[in-house]
Design a protein with these regions (language model features):
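TRNA-binding/sensing appendages of the translation machinery
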Residues: 21-28
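Soluble acyl-CoA-dependent acyltransferase catalytic core bearing the H(X)4D motif
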Residues: 1-12, 29-401, 405-448
Length: 448
């Protein structure tokens, strides 16, 4: 049995699998917009996606429960395995032409992925005017995080002329029934894990107590409705670099400050007020080890910070974001409430299976809004010869929350992908407009 045909889910993957529900599906998405060479380009793209998907091993993987009596500490886990009846036409769908890609994407993001099949979909949305089409990719977070989803999606794009990577050393796979002689070592490792988990848990608890005196906003809280709305904003990356070079910090600092300023504008326009408002933002951090031979699964931690929504000065907001991010980086991704994802590594599979409902209900206690960045290659991607011009990433929406923000940079543009509960945030377009206005405000402030 090779690693391409079966591999056990990493702890965080298993956690995402078991907190999934119809009201809060744990799939991430990406809406790619392509310039079309002809009115039939969308239909041709759907044919290409179906034909190429069969040749991407990761897209053939389904998730199946596995009970392992020979490994009690992994009892109740799950595995990725090649689906013997895989049919790409079950996953690639061509829709009727539309004039609003995001309106269609919002409705499609509402729908959970079918758990008995490889958990991904590609929805092709032809534009009504025939000059463009979009593809909405959906991947369950247990199948792929943002980085792996990018790799899988790139596998069905037009091939690029790139240097061949150096071969990686082959690693023997453990299989589903490991050597019994290894059990004593596994037990010692599990006991050590308990100690590390207690350290992380203490960090989470301390950080949570530190944040009790601050205030979020009712606009960021929502009872589950199962509805979704999406929006996208593109801004010039040169403008972001102009701000960074003037004020200092990183591109990510500037983008987080843009989100804080946009929230301030949006809340004030709604009449909700921003005095004393500083919502907790979770900033995910990848902990993948580079260039390993075996799939690692999701390896995430995160930084938790208060967004300075209450501050009326845009440059001061940016300075406060820089200070908070520098403090988080100095402490490392294993400290604070953002490290809660690391606890998944120290919970046995049965804990994820039965504790998932409790974990998803506790999300609002840890953070108020997710702000995540998804790296994209600077190379121009094409599908059927049609160039990819825009990419809007979509993050899963945590239970109890109304809004999530994902950010990518591609070909000189920054793309903000917004996912919201459609009933709680009927004015998502106003928040999208506030993002553009905030970039303009920062650029103007730096010119003074």
């Amino acid at each position: 049995m090779t690693s391409e045909t079966s591999d056990l889910l990493a702890p965080l993957d298993l956690a995402f699998w078991h907190i999934d529900s119809d009201l809060h599906p744990m799939h991430l998405g990406a809406l790619g917009v392509f310039s079309a060479h002809s009115p039939t380009a969308g239909a041709h793209a759907a044919d290409l996606l179906a034909a190429r998907a069969a040749g991407v091993p990761g897209l053939r993987m389904r998730i199946r429960d596995v009970w392992q009596p020979l490994l009690p500490l992994a009892f109740g886990g799950a595995t990725r395995e090649t689906a013997p009846d895989f049919d790409p036409l079950d996953h690639v769908r061509l829709h009727a032409p539309t004039s609003d890609f995001h309106a269609e994407a919002g409705r499609l993001m509402e729908r959970s992925l079918e758990r008995g099949r490889p958990p991904w979909e590609a929805h092709v949305l032809p534009g009504e005017d025939g000059t463009s089409f979009a593809v909405l990719f959906k991947f369950h977070h247990a199948l792929a995080d943002g980085l792996r989803a990018l790799t899988l999606a790139a596998g069905v794009m037009d091939p690029l002329d790139l240097p061949k990577p150096r071969p990686r050393p082959e690693q023997p796979t453990a299989g589903l029934f490991p050597d019994v002689r290894k059990l004593p070592g596994l037990v010692r490792g599990a006991l050590s894990d308990v100690g590390r988990a207690l350290d992380i848990g203490a960090s989470v608890a301390r950080s949570g107590l530190d944040n009790l005196s601050n205030r979020s906003s009712a606009a960021l809280v929502a009872e589950p409705t199962g509805t979704r709305r999406t929006a996208g904003v593109a801004v010039d990356l040169d403008d972001v670099h102009r701000v960074r070079k003037t004020v200092g910090g990183t591109v990510n600092d500037v983008l987080i400050a843009v989100v804080a300023g946009a929230l301030r504008r949006w809340l004030d326009e709604r009449g909700d007020g921003t005095e004393g408002v500083a919502p907790r933002a979770l900033i995910p951090v990848s902990k993948r080890r580079p260039r390993t031979a075996h799939p690692q699964g999701n390896r995430l931690s995160g930084y938790l910070m208060r967004l300075p929504v209450d501050d009326p000065d845009p440059l001061r907001r940016l300075a406060r974001v820089r200070t908070a991010m520098d403090r988080n980086k100095d402490a490392g991704p294993g400290r604070g409430a953002g490290a809660v994802a690391l606890l998944a590594d120290h919970v046995p599979p049965l804990g994820h299976r039965f504790g998932g409902p409790l974990v998803k209900q506790a999300a609002r206690l840890w953070f108020d809004i997710l702000v995540t960045s998804v790296p994209l290659p600077s190379l121009g991607l094409r599908l059927g010869g049609n160039p990819l011009t825009e990419v809007y990433p979509f993050a899963p929406l945590a239970q109890g929350q109304s809004l999530a923000v994902a950010i990518s940079t591609y070909r000189g543009q920054v793309h903000f992908g917004l996912v919201a509960d459609a009933e709680a945030v009927p004015d998502l377009d106003r928040f999208a407009a506030a993002l553009t206005a905030e970039v303009e405000t920062l650029v103007a402030a730096c010119a003074l």
